[in-house]
Amino acid sequence: MRFLIPLLPEVAEHWAWFVVTMALISIFYGALLALMQINFRRLLAFAIISQTGLIVIGLFDFNTYGMEGSIILSVSFGLATAGMLLSLGMIYKRTHTAFIPRLGGMFDTNAAIAVLFVICALSTMVMPGTPGFDGIHLLIEGTIKGQGWLVAIAILFGNVLTVGLLLRAFQQIFIATPRRSQEPFANTRHASSLPSPRNEWIIAIIICGSLIATGIHTSPWLHIIDQNIDSISNVYSNTGTHYPDTLTTQPIISKDN
């Protein structure tokens, strides 16, 4: 958005159909592959691929709503992904395994890790009260205007898959009982014997608090974003591509910033 769309608007619009098609494929491809994983690292990696497709579609809507939604989702997914990676790292530190069938029942003694994972997962699911909710609302509105109803509906179905895979991962890791024997890991420290220390609670509170605070009070973020993307979104009109004479001299970021 900082370089391709302002510098090459004709090229961006000409290839928008291809980019949006590949983004839609990545949404479903990443989500379906994530559902098939039994390694939580690979699961999260494919889930990130799926969510990246949403951001790309918003950028190529070529309107203010879509671009605002993409930026808000970028912030939301960045915080949420960091939180989930951190929680999974804590799990691996305890169990020395990333194999989901060997995990389970970790909520009772590792509540901080569970709370961190579920709040970040809810933000990735774009639930109300998280920044992802406002971001997906703007993204869908921009997609309806820029790409049409079919693409917007496809985005919603892709998000349903993301909800399913993250809830399934939470259930298998933190609630369900292990489906495989722990014998190969008998010499390692099991998660149930290591309750969450104070520093893990502090980290969980900071990340979860940032997500919730950003989700409840999104207006300042939108105000900052509006100042920086107006010069980009105004390049395009609803009836076609319009290139104002000031495009080459208008700064992408206002001087007030």
Stretches found by the model and what they are:
Residues 1-137, 141-171:
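Hydrophobic transmembrane alpha-helices and their helix-loop junctions in integral membrane proteins
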Residues 110-112, 168-257:
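Cytoplasmic/organellar membrane-interface segments at the starts of transmembrane helices
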